[in-house]
């Protein structure tokens, strides 16, 4: 949903990070289907050893490590209009470095939109972190969604396979 909201009024690429390669590919496929475009055209992805995006792509999904690597040759991430860091609660080293980098980049790129998403993140803490230094706290936007029922099973409910007496 956030990706589609960002397409309006954009003047550059939307970069969306995912913590895992499979997630980046899967989400890219889904977004391309939702928009009605072939994967690799308007919506692309890049993971280690695989780049299915074009210069004309509007949305690029990638692992957080790929975006972090891009900062080495494009310090201001100039081709991006919006950066979405998804699953920020994963708190990997790459995500933590990326969030720190984006915080220091924002004063130099006030036009850059940064969106951090998570189902379980401490909203107030991140809002204060991205504000601070004389700036107001970053805005918090809550997007409600579907919740899925969770069934809890214990080992008692799972039948144990028959084991041979000797191996």
Indicate residue ranges for each PLM-predicted region.
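A short, hydrophobic C-terminal helix/tail in secreted or cell-surface proteins
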Residues: 158-167
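P-loop NTPase motor module signature
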Residues: 1-4, 8-159
């Amino acid at each position: 949903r956030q990706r589609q909201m960002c397409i309006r009024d954009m003047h550059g690429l939307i970069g969306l990070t995912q913590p895992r390669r499979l997630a980046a590919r899967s989400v890219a496929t889904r977004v391309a289907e939702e928009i009605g475009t072939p994967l690799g055209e308007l919506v692309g992805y890049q993971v280690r050893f695989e780049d299915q995006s074009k210069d004309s792509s509007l949305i690029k999904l990638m692992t957080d490590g790929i975006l972090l690597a891009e900062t080495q040759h494009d310090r201001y991430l100039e081709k991006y209009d919006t950066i979405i860091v998804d699953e920020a609660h994963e708190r990997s080293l790459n995500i933590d470095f990326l969030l720190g980098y984006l915080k220091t980049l924002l004063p130099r790129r006030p036009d850059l939109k940064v969106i951090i998403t998570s189902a379980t993140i401490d909203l107030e803490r991140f809002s204060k972190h991205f504000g601070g230094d004389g700036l107001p706290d970053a805005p918090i936007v809550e997007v409600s969604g579907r919740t899925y029922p969770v069934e809890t099973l214990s080992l008692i409910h799972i039948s144990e396979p028959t084991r041979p007496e000797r191996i």
